[in-house]
Design a protein with these regions (language model features):
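Long, charge-rich alpha-helical interaction segments
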Residues: 1-74
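Short, solvent-exposed helix-helix connector turns and helix-capping sites enriched
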Residues: 9, 80-81, 137
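Conserved AWS/pre-SET-to-SET junction and N-terminal core of the SET lysine methyltransferase domain
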Residues: 66-97
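Conserved metal-binding segment of the jelly-roll/cupin
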Residues: 94-113
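A broad, low-specificity signal marking well-ordered, structured residues that form hydrophobic/aromatic
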Residues: 101, 117, 173
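Residues that cap or initiate secondary-structure elements
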Residues: 109, 125, 179-181
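C-terminal, non-catalytic macromolecule-binding modules
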Residues: 114-162
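A short glycine-rich, His/Asp/Glu-containing loop-to-beta-strand
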Residues: 154-184
Length: 185
């Protein structure tokens, strides 16, 4: 199903992962336990990760280790969150200082750590899929999910730089220089 995930496949996976289908969540809880157990095993060295591998296999193994680290970290904070089951399917990006990305509406994402500036248009439509104590609206998430919009990373440019955003609602400028800049309002 996920070898070539299209819009319908992703919507199905997200929808069925985040809802219990009326079964009381027993199967989902078992799946979460299995995922966390497997992730811990990878991190403890019980499953081969990068040893004895080279090239493409090593890169894939490193991705598995990174996903296992994220699963374990999130499972410690949100032990029964169904969104844990989605972690291995998500792309992990690490932004360096000055880098930016535009995450459009409907793109499933999570901030795992660090400092970031998030700019949104004025709205009241944040839809959460998990990893929160706030309300999770799975139906709205599935209805709004956009799986075709993969954001690209914009690299920093010295001096004055306006980050590219495909909307007219706002702009984000980065100003770097040797002098102090005072802004009066």
């Amino acid at each position: 199903l996920l070898d070539q995930p299209g819009q319908d496949a992703w919507l199905h996976v997200v929808g069925t992962t985040l809802t219990d289908g009326g079964g009381g969540g027993t199967d989902r809880e078992r799946d979460i336990d299995r995922l966390v157990e497997a992730a811990r095993k990878v991190l403890e060295g019980g499953e081969p990760a990068t040893a004895g591998r080279s090239g493409h296999e090593t890169v894939e193994a490193e991705i598995v280790v990174q996903a296992a680290e994220v699963v374990c970290r999130l499972a410690d904070r949100y032990p029964r969150d169904p969104a844990l089951l989605l972690v291995p399917m998500l792309q992990r990006l690490v932004l360096q200082p000055g880098e930016a990305m535009f995450v459009g509406p409907g793109v499933l994402h999570a901030y795992l750590g660090g400092m970031a500036l998030e700019v949104m248009t004025p709205c009241d439509n944040v839809v959460r899929g998990g990893f929160t104590s706030k309300h999770v609206d799975t139906r709205a998430l599935v209805d709004l999910l956009d799986t075709g919009n993969i954001p690209g990373v914009q690299r920093p440019v010295e001096g004055v730089h306006c980050y590219e955003v495909p909307v007219e609602d706002f702009a984000v400028w980065r100003i770097e220089g040797r002098h102090t800049l005072q802004v009066r309002t």
